Structures are given as C-alpha cells and as structure tokens.
C-alpha cells in the first residue's frame, strides 16, 4: 500500500471506552470506564501500571509487550487462565466488543472473540492498531539482532496485516526442515517441498519488510527538519532484502530455494538454518549526527526510538485509516520539559488514544484537563 503525499482526511479515532480484566497479573478483577482521550497511570513501581497496558497490548496479535508465556500472565494462585475484555469505539467499524484470554493449565493458546464470535488474533487488526514504547526497548539498538528483527516485524504487521502469518508459517517450515536435517533424513522430496515453502514465504517477508522501510523513510522525510526528536535512517541488512526491487521476485525465490538445497549439509552440521530472512538485521542511524544508533548516548537512543515510533504511528494511521492506540511506559521520565511538551502535542496531532505510565504525576501536569488520571496501587485504580 502506498503512502499519500499528505493525509487527505484525519484518521478515525479508535478508543477503549471500557476495559475489564479477570485474573490478569496482579488484577483479580477490574472494570475501568474510559473516555476517548489520553489516559495517565501513576503510582509506585510494582503497583500494576505496566500490567494494565500489557493487558491492552493483548488486543493485538502476539504475546503482548512483555512477550510472556500465557501461564505467567495469569494471576498467581488463581484457578484457570486470564480474561481481557475491551469495548471499543471505532468510527470505521462501529462499536466493537473484544474478548481474549486463556483457559489456563497449559491448555492451548489464547482465544479471541470479536462481537461474541470466535476470531483469529490477526482479525484484531481490523479494529485497532496498537503500538508501544517500553523500557525493555531501551537496549534495542545495542542488543541482539533478534530483538530488532522482532521490532521490525511488528512495525510491518501494523501496516501489512498478512505479515504476521507469513512469519509464523516461515518459522514453522524452518523448524520442520531443521528437524529433518538433524534427524539425518535424506528424503529429498520432503525437503524440497519444505524449502519451496520457505523460499516463497521468505521472499514475501523480505519484500514486505523492504516496502515498510521505504514507506517509513518517506514519512520521516515529510517531517520537519528540526523536530523535537532526531530523524532516523533505517536500513535492512539481509541477503534477500538487499535485492528487493533490484531483481525479480521469482528470481530471488529460486535463488533462495537453491541456497537452501545447497546448504543442507552445512545446516545439518550447524544444527540450524544459516541463510534466510530469519537472519536479517535492522540497522538504524542517528541522521543529525551521522552516527550508528548503537554508538549514541542512552538519551539519544531513547529520543531516536521515540521519533521512529511516532513516525511509524503517523504512517500506520495514514495507511489503515485508524489512529493507533499508543502504550507509552515510563516515557516522560526520560524527556526534558521541552520534549515532553512536544510529545504531548504530537500525540494530540495523531488523534489517537495514548496510555502513559509514570511514578511522578507532575510530569504529566500539562495534560490536566485533556486526559484521565488514575493512581494505581496494588492492582487498584483510583481516579485523580
């Protein structure tokens, strides 16, 4: 999907008007009515602020912003699994009721129901796009490539709803191939079939990533040159991604298929598949300083990450027609007064609903009158 040269109309607001939790982390039971605006959650560390926005992150595909095992999410010493229910106001699809949760005891994955009808997790993207910035992402640019790749794929998923299934199917096929190789199988016909699937999916994954990076780069170019958050230049370091747009997709697919076939002995010895989009890395540079993000200061990395997420949020709103719901955990504490004010202004401009957490309410005073404030203590919320 192509980004327009400008936003022809304001993206539709999607907001949570009521959130209910049962046996989620430290919440035995919660029913929280909400307005359409921003929400600020303050309280001491360990009170449950992040747990609440983690619950909201489960209204999108995946395992939430902590990537936790479902049994770990269910409240300790509670019988059964957990349940999350959200009533959404969505101008595109009308009001929607979303429920998700698990049965507990390791019984299957989580279930999703939309308007009381069983649905897939990917169907959630038809009703809301949810993005987040959390402290665990502070080391994104200096950590392992797998974290950046996961971050990249979540960005792609927000603008290409089929991407998540492609990645899951590719990883499933790759595990099957690894298992066959490790078992010493010489069933070429079976391996050929799996590698055909990997080649097709892998090329599609690389193409989707390259397209997303091109669109994000175009969005960043449209932003003011001297904005409050530094501009990022993003590059993909991957054998397939680097050739997207240069060579025909069918040629790339055939070449990857040949690489997999020729690499069977090497991959069997290594115990894993050594080539493919599962090895791709996202390289980010701080444009004003012409410096790799990994070499920037901690504060510069944080500002760069926030700027990238906000640019992606603009793109997501433009392409989907829905202003994304943003989950911003402990974000204000890392920003000076000028950048906090700029962030709040950008959130208003985006037109979506943002949930922000922090230990110091004073950091959010500029939002007084424009946001709902709650104090969180031991899994209990009190309006302030």
UniProtKB/Swiss-Prot annotation:
GO cellular component, as recorded: cytoplasm
Pfam families in alphabetical order: SMC_N (PF02463)
Binding site for ATP: 43-50
Keywords of the record: ATP-binding, Cytoplasm, DNA damage, DNA repair, DNA replication, DNA-binding, Nucleotide-binding, SOS response
TM region positions: none
PANTHER family: DNA REPLICATION AND REPAIR PROTEIN RECF
HAMAP family membership: RecF
NCBIfam families from the UniProt entry: recf (TIGR00611)
Protein purpose: The RecF protein is involved in DNA metabolism; it is required for DNA replication and normal SOS inducibility. RecF binds preferentially to single-stranded, linear DNA. It also seems to bind ATP.
Protein name per the record: DNA replication and repair protein RecF
Taxonomic source organism: Brucella abortus (strain 2308)
């Amino acid at each position: 999907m192509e980004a327009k040269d400008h936003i022809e109309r304001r993206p539709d607001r999607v907001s949570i008007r009521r959130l209910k939790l049962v046996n989620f982390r430290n919440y035995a039971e919660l029913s929280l009515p909400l307005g359409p605006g921003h929400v600020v959650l303050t309280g001491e560390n360990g009170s449950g602020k992040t747990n609440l926005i983690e619950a909201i992150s489960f209204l999108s595909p995946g395992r939430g912003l902590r990537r936790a095992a479902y049994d770990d999410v269910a409240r300790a010493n509670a019988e059964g699994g957990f349940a999350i229910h959200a009533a959404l106001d969505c101008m595109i699809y009308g009001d929607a009721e979303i429920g998700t949760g698990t049965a507990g005891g390791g019984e299957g994955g989580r279930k999703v129901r939309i308007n009381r009808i069983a649905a897939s997790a990917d169907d959630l993207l038809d009703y809301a796009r949810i993005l987040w910035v959390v402290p665990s992402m502070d080391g994104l640019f200096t950590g392992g490539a797998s974290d950046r790749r996961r971050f990249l794929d979540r960005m792609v998923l927000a603008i290409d709803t089929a991407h998540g299934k492609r990645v899951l199917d590719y990883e499933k096929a790759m595990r099957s191939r690894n298992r066959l190789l490790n078992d010493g199988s010489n069933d070429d016909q079976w391996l050929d079939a799996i590698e055909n699937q990997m080649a097709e999916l892998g090329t599609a994954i690389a193409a989707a990533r390259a397209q997303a990076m091109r669109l994000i780069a175009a969005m960043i170019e449209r932003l003011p040159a001297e904005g409050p958050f530094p501009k990022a230049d993003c590059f993909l370091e991957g054998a397939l991604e680097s050739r997207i747009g240069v060579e025909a997709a069918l040629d790339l697919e055939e070449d990857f298929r040949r690489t997999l076939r020729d690499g069977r002995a090497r991959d069997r010895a290594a115990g894993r598949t050594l080539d493919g989009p599962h090895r791709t890395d996202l390289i980010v540079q701080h444009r004003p300083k012409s410096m790799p993000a990994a070499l920037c200061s901690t504060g510069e990395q944080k500002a760069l990450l926030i700027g990238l997420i906000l640019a992606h949020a603009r793109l997501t709103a433009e392409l989907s027609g829905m202003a994304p719901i943003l989950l911003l955990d402990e974000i204000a504490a890392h920003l000076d007064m000028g950048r906090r004010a700029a962030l709040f202004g950008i959130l208003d401009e985006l037109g979506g609903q943002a949930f922000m957490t922090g230990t110091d309410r004073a950091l959010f005073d500029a939002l007084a009158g424009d946001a709902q404030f709650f104090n969180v203590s031991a899994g209990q919320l009190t309006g302030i």
